[in-house]
């Protein structure tokens, strides 16, 4: 899946919309979770969902952080390494 820039409701902004990059599906035990995705917000990886009833993404960039302990980190870490020089 090619990364796509989307408008999403961000938890850190109390649900207001902001910019996020949809990277691909969220995996659990090497299987994709239905309707759960990994996003890049700023220079961090986060989880989020698509609300199909309203057609909008909701990203948890407060508590849904994907770090080194998460299996998704190894899959998507290249996207945070690309822009680690501050040009996001």
What does each of the following model-derived ranges do?
Residues 1-2, 78-88:
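Short intrinsically disordered terminal tails
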Residues 3-12:
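SH3-family beta-barrel domains
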Residues 18-73:
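Acidic, low-complexity, intrinsically disordered interaction modules
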């Amino acid at each position: 899946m090619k990364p796509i820039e989307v408008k999403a409701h961000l938890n850190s902004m109390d649900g207001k919309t902001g910019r996020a990059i949809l990277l691909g599906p969220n995996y659990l035990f090497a299987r994709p979770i239905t309707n759960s995705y990994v996003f890049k917000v700023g220079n961090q990886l986060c989880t989020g969902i698509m609300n199909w009833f309203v057609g909008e993404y909701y990203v948890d960039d407060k508590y849904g952080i994907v770090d080194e302990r998460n299996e998704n980190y190894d899959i998507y870490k290249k996207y945070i390494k690309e822009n680690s020089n501050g040009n996001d």
